[in-house]
Amino acid sequence: MSLLILSEELYRKTQKRDDTVIVDTRPFSEFKKGHIPGALNVDLFQLHWFDTSKRGIKNFTRQTRMMLSTIGIKKETNVVFYDNVSGITAARGVWLLLYFSHERVCMLDGGFEKWRRDGYPVELKSNPLQYHKFRGKVDNSILATANEIERSLENKNLTIVDARSKEEYNGSDVRAVRRGHIPSAMNIDWQIDIENGNFKSKDKLSRIYSKIPRNNQVITYCQGGYRAANVFVALKMLGYKKVKMYIGSWGEWGNRPDLPVSE
């Protein structure tokens, strides 16, 4: 399943009423003003996680599984996440389901703004959540931890991508106890992937990420694992096989005095 879906294709799915769950990842304050018909509202921006210790990951997995169970996802369910544009919370939703080996997942390219511009219907009523115990199998190959990164900093076959702004990367915008970035990380602001609310073409994305060796292990991070999820999706669309997201991101790394930083 492609990681992106266009408005036209999603509209056809809503008409067929097939086994597709549409998840609006925006805050309820935006959802209630209008959303895609049938969409469930789950504000994924509330699911920050800054502890990637063994215990922390165990708790993250348990709590995320509980959250996904409220959406009613079965093995055969197609899941479409969206936010206002091809943004960070929809990408986080895609990453979450891939973490649980659920590959029938994508995000709406252009998000709700594109859906509305294209003239597709909008509804105001809320749709009830439908519980179904989510049983996805964890895929640790796409999740990075702080300890894993620290052990691998000298590995030439590792590329770390900092998806934050230039100001956060160089330390002039401080959002943790310490400023700066993870040593050796390259800075590619996630916003450079987006044009008029949509992902740029694969040709343009390929040029953006041309300095990343195809065979390297790539780890993306940001402040809280959302912008990094967007870059994760972009890299997967380009065919990179070994991509992980560091969910703790700078919210964990920048607040741990035992970890190295660069400015």
Give the residues covered by each predicted segment.
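Cytosolic catalytic domains that perform sulfur/thiol-centered chemistry
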Residues: 1-263
